[in-house]
Amino acid sequence: DITEDIWWEAKFLDAIKNTEGTISKWGESPITIPAGDCTGEGNTPDESGSETPTDPVSYTYVFEDNFPLVGDYDFNDVVLDVKTYYHREKKTNHIKRIQLDVTLAAAGASKPLGVGLRITGINKSDIREVKTGGDDSRFQESFNSSYNKFRYNNVTYMEDSDPSVVIPIAGEVHNVFGVEPGEMVNTGIGVTAKEYTYEVIIELTDQTRTEPLFSKDNLDFFICYQYKSMEQRMEVHLYEFWGYGATAAGTIQQENLDLAGNNTWAICVPYGFRYPKETINVSRTDIPEASAYPEFIYWAQDRTQYTEWYEHPVEENVYR
């Protein structure tokens, strides 16, 4: 009799647990059991729960190194694909760690370039620890390059002598790819190479936050290089971060900003952006079809216009 079997099954389950009990997998009981002669070591439930990463927030950053001059304006001197993961505790939804996967996709510069990340709006005290992963050894070895301009600390993975949170990403980008400075990589000219990813894992001091400590709007990726005999490195930041100035070890030269006007030498675009091929200007008004994105120039002049310019490339002039 099926009905009788179900009744006996229910009675059996009631018999093996009290009204506040629970049936759990081996090693996952949420009930505290004191140690004793009959209970052995007892049981202390794990209150932390397991962590799970959220779906990544993904963007691509492209840079032009001729700031504040136009040059070839092809925005492939450094190309970064960035994914941000928030590792949350399943039980509480608290954010424990924030992971940035920074992939170096291209190096189209004719001079040595470094890459850094300043995280605005937070303090070093907000970070318990920084760890690295992925292809981190390739990136970290690039800080040994004679072209490196970062005061890199190989214990904290941040930059020394800067009160802000500045995380060096690459001392010299060509070095990460294993080629000499000036060699074009993944731009349609020069060599085609594997992309490499630097995982930056930031463990938070406050382990009870449910809202992210920082987001894309705080990620100030920049490129830098030696300019003539200047002691400070020359930095190229996204237009949105010009108001923060340079990092402690860098300069952006106010006269350069005045000359630049509304133009930009670094942009954040949707992930997987198909950047211009080498020597192809991102946008031209005289011969639009000879550029990569004819609408870009109008967006750069007024950012309320042509906001989807990146969806309308000249196919033969873009890479990827």
Residue spans of the language-model regions?
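Extracellular distal adhesion/interaction modules in secreted or cell-surface proteins
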Residues: D1-R320
